[in-house]
UniProtKB/Swiss-Prot annotation:
Protein name per the record: Dolichyl pyrophosphate Glc1Man9GlcNAc2 alpha-1,3-glucosyltransferase
Clinical condition linked: Congenital disorder of glycosylation 1H: A form of congenital disorder of glycosylation, a multisystem disorder caused by a defect in glycoprotein biosynthesis and characterized by under-glycosylated serum glycoproteins. Congenital disorders of glycosylation result in a wide variety of clinical features, such as defects in the nervous system development, psychomotor retardation, dysmorphic features, hypotonia, coagulation disorders, and immunodeficiency.
Domain of life of the organism encoding this protein: Eukaryota
Family membership noted in the UniProt record: Belongs to the ALG6/ALG8 glucosyltransferase family.
Keyword Translocase (UniProt): no
Name of the gene encoding the protein in the UniProt record: ALG8
Length: 526
């Protein structure tokens, strides 16, 4: 707090927040890391040791390169720094290699790349409406947003304990959003195009970008009622946008097109042979669907409606990533999830087209695209919830309704990440960090909107408080029961299903809010 006090007086409070979280990241260096640590070490080795023609074919390790080319080049650049730390980490055949120098290099590379995220957060803070400015520094929307983003619990544990490089990728996304708020549309489009070629999961929010840029940049004027003035369409602008996307894509995919390897690259990026859900079900609609199928199958067996010999052998809770058949409900195909996702996204896209509401409307649409894809996508990872939580953070300091949705989404979504850290030493760390972040989020947003109605109703409060007993049950009670051996998947099942309820509720509540705002806007115009 001393650093923050000094920073308040000099106006450098943002630097103090950034420095503080960086020190925390350094303290987390010795903690547990997941298999993703080996994944990225292997990618360093592949890009450093092999010619580009072999990058997307190399399969010595099961952790093959399955990110777009820009990320592969990023690993290539890192590898030329890594060789000064430990040359052995760059050997393709050194599977599961993890020396102390390798650990330090990979951990510090994540921390260093977060510089882009810090800069993007600063740019986003410049876009925040300053109407609700409190007397105290800690009550200012910009300060609250800075803490919500820089100290985001999910990003901390996923990148700096579990191990991934999400920080600088989200930095690109937030910087792109900031540029659109600043009406620097070409820069925003360029940054997002670059981002897509770093990690293709951001395709989930591409519809929001495409529609917003077409509606608000390529059409230069509206009619008095807010509808499109078709004659204002600018061919120059749409060609400029197309050229930006084309050039970025050509730079990324061009070398592999020249090598006639695009089919191989895309087969790595989109492995549809994986199952509907990850080993640990992401808390989405399909988790509820799978749970219902399990319940119906148990009831069917008890009532002898089902033949035990006809029950599929592949278990959805076995911890294996595989395809499986549902027992009672219809099995779900990749095409079915795509259709469900498109149907879920369309209403928000229509609202953005017919009632743009400026950059804020774009941001709400982007969040809904991210959430809808999380809810209905194929083989969704639990970490993908951050794609909705981070942009929702920007909305949370603007309106009380959005703050309420954000708190439900972020608390539930962050808790759903707990199974990523399953080792005993990390248990107190994840509980303490989440408690601190959650308490701060709720208290700061309640203070910001203290003149408005309470952020939670009794049902929402009861649900969020239920996460406490759930954690006690899963971590401290279940391990001492006889069910631990026979039903080891129950804690994961309970966590996934319970969190799926909260995330589904937040998604539905945000959708209702967007549709109502759109309808009210049309009524006012009339």
């Amino acid at each position: 707090m001393a650093a923050l006090t000094i920073a308040t007086g000099t106006g450098n409070w943002f630097s103090a927040l950034a420095l503080g979280v960086t020190l925390l990241k350094c303290l987390l260096i010795p903690t547990y890391h997941s298999t993703d640590f080996e994944v990225h070490r292997n990618w360093l080795a592949i890009t450093h040791s092999l010619p580009i023609s072999q990058w997307y074919y190399e399969a010595t390790s099961e952790w093959t390169l399955d990110y777009p080319p820009f990320f592969a080049w990023f690993e290539y650049i890192l590898s030329h720094v890594a060789k000064y730390f430990d040359q052995e980490m760059l050997n393709v055949h050194n599977l599961n290699y993890s020396s102390s120098r390798t650990l330090l290099f990979q951990r510090f590379s994540v921390i260093f790349m977060d510089v882009l995220f810090v800069y993007a957060v600063r740019e986003c803070c410049k876009c925040i409406d300053g109407k609700k400015v409190g007397k105290e520094l800690t009550e200012k929307p910009k300060f609250i947003l800075s803490v919500l983003l820089l100290w985001n619990f999910g990003l901390l544990i996923v990148d700096h304990i579990h191990f991934q490089y999400n920080g600088f990728l989200f930095g690109l996304m937030l910087l792109s959003i900031a540029r659109l708020f600043q009406k620097r549309h070409m820069e925003g489009a360029f940054l997002f195009a670059v981002l897509l070629h770093f990690k293709h999961i951001y395709l989930y929010v591409a519809p929001a970008y495409g529609v917003y840029l077409l509606r608000s940049y390529c059409f230069t004027a509206n009619k008095p009622d807010g509808s499109i003035r078709w004659k204002s369409f600018s061919f120059v602008r749409v060609i400029s946008l197309g050229l930006v996307v084309f050039l970025v894509s050509a730079l990324s995919l061009g070398p592999f097109l020249a090598l006639n390897q695009l089919p191989q690259v895309f087969s790595r990026l989109f492995p549809f042979k994986r199952g509907l859900c990850h080993a640990y079900w992401a808390p989405n609609f399909w988790a509820l669907y799978n749970a219902l199928d399990k319940v119906l199958s148990v009831i069917g067996l008890k009532l002898k409606f089902l033949d035990p010999n006809n029950i599929p052998k592949a278990s959805m809770t076995s911890g294996l990533v595989q395809q499986f058949q549902h027992t009672v409900l219809p099995s779900v195909t990749p095409l079915a999830t795509l259709i469900c996702t498109l149907i879920a996204i369309l209403p928000s896209i229509f609202c953005l087209w017919f009632k743009p509401q400026g950059p804020r409307g774009f941001l709400r649409c982007l969040t809904l695209c991210a959430l809808s894809s999380f809810m209905f996508g194929w083989h969704v990872h639990e970490k993908a919830i951050l794609l909705a939580i981070l942009p929702m953070s920007l909305l949370s300091v603007g309106k009380a309704g959005d703050a309420s949705i954000f708190l439900i989404l972020t608390t539930t979504g962050h808790y759903s990440l707990f199974p990523l850290l399953f080792t005993a030493p990390e248990l107190p760390i994840k509980i303490l960090l989440m408690l601190l972040f959650t308490i701060y989020s709720i208290s700061s947003l309640k203070t910001l909107f203290r003149k408005e109605k309470p952020l939670f109703n009794w049902m929402e409060t009861f649900y969020l408080l239920g996460l406490g007993p759930l954690e006690v049950c899963c971590e401290f009670v279940f391990p001492f029961t006889s069910w631990k051996v026979k039903y080891p998947f129950i804690p994961l099942l309970l966590t996934s299903v319970y969190c799926a309820v909260g995330i589904t509720y937040a998604w539905f509540k945000l959708y209702v809010s967007v549709l109502i705002d759109s309808a009210i806007g049309k009524t006012k115009k009339q």
